[in-house]
């Protein structure tokens, strides 16, 4: 069965479903790397991707946003040693789906809404407060516009509205 659209899982109600020791067959999250680049360098700015809505972000949307941000930064900056990109959200919540059959005679084969708990199909990160940090890039001053552009493209991969905030890491010298 194909993957349902992300809008089916964008909003949530009820407590998080995270106890993996009780859930058989939870698929692994697609996002595996959470830090990329050189974290030891001295950077001037941190560009943050913050949420403007409350909801859920599926693991494949997080991975797509991470990949496109990394690809944009490496193509514009040149190499991975001139910035530090990190993802702060982890997809803990297990998403379930009650699969329904849609063909002639399906009503004889399935139970409908009886025992409709569903089977695990993926994981999602829950955003519970406005302004939550999803990911951030630390850059030098000359790469600041590249980081903003990379996050603009990456935000199109996420199901929630986001905003890009620039935070200076060093004090500006006034002379």
Curated annotation (Swiss-Prot):
Iron keyword on record: no
One term of GO molecular function: structural constituent of ribosome
InterPro entries: Ribosomal_uL16, Ribosomal_uL16_arc, Ribosomal_uL16_CS_euk_arc, Ribosomal_uL16_dom, Ribosomal_uL16_euk_arch, Ribosomal_uL16_sf
A biological-process GO annotation: translation
CDD domains listed in its UniProt record: Ribosomal_L16_L10e
NCBIfam families: PRK04199.1-1, PRK04199.1-4
Family: Belongs to the universal ribosomal protein uL16 family.
Name of the molecule in the record: Large ribosomal subunit protein uL16
The organism's taxonomic lineage, starting at the top: Archaea, Thermoproteota, Thermoprotei, Sulfolobales, Sulfolobaceae
């Amino acid at each position: 069965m194909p993957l349902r659209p992300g809008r089916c899982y964008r909003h949530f109600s009820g407590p998080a479903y995270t106890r993996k020791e009780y859930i058989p067959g939870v698929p692994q999250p697609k996002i595996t790397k959470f830090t990329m680049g050189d974290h030891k360098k001295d950077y001037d700015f941190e560009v943050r991707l913050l949420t403007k809505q409350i909801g859920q972000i599926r693991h494949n949307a997080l991975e797509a946003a991470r990949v496109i941000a990394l690809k944009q930064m490496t193509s514009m900056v040149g190499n991975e040693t001139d910035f530090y990109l990190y993802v702060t959200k982890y997809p803990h919540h297990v998403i379930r789906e009650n699969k329904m059959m849609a063909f002639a005679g399906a009503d004889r084969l399935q139970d409908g809404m009886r025992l409709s708990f569903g089977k695990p199909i993926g994981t999602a990160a829950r955003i519970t407060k406005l302004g939550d940090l999803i990911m951030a890039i630390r850059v030098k001053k000359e790469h600041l516009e590249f980081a903003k552009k990379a996050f603009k493209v990456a935000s199109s991969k996420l199901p929630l509205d986001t905003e890009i905030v620039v935070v200076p890491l060093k004090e500006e010298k006034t002379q």
